[in-house]
């Protein structure tokens, strides 16, 4: 399968299964919900930036390690407290930071990061994280060298920062 006339480089990123498609469906529902979250069985999906308040938090809190003070963190933590069955987290953009912070804040829950897309982390070297994914030209996650980078031929920054393109290729053969 080709995407924008290029064969994507998708080594070891969960293709060949419906992993990314399930995450897309959950994140779509989180973005559509009032509280920016959606639960499916034991997985909490958390929407990323979607309004001016989130943009404010992106600029004034995330770069300074103050994710716990972000509005999205408070929303997700409330849902987490009300749902003790949640064991896995999926996030996109802002909510990647929120997911990671929730995991750290609740060690007793043994929360697992199922997937994070377009994470705004700064990691210039070191080990790749199994469940962090980014597109090659994503401007938000360009300093996250700890994620698995996929080249889908997306050059538009808005498209490259999305999470839904992974699901289009969920049954592609790895190269």
Predicted regions, residues:
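Alpha/beta hydrolase fold serine-hydrolase catalytic domain that processes acyl esters and thioesters
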Residues: 1-88, 107-175
């Amino acid at each position: 399968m080709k995407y924008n006339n290029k064969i994507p480089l998708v080594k070891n990123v969960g293709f060949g299964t419906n992993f990314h498609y399930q995450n897309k469906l959950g994140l779509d529902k989180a973005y559509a919900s009032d509280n920016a979250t959606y639960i499916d069985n034991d997985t909490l999906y958390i929407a990323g930036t979607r309004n001016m308040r989130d943009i404010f938090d992106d600029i004034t809190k995330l770069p300074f390690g103050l994710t716990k003070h972000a509005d999205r963190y408070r929303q997700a933590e409330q849902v987490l407290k009300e749902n003790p069955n949640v064991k896995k987290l999926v996030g996109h953009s802002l909510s990647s930071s929120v997911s990671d912070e929730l995991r750290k804040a609740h060690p007793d829950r043994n929360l697992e990061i199922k997937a994070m897309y377009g994470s705004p982390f700064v990691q210039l070297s070191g080990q790749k994280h199994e469940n962090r994914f980014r597109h090659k030209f994503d401007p938000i996650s360009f300093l996250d060298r700890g994620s698995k980078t996929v080249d889908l031929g997306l050059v538009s920054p808005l498209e490259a920062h999305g999470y839904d393109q992974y699901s289009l290729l969920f049954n592609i053969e790895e190269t």
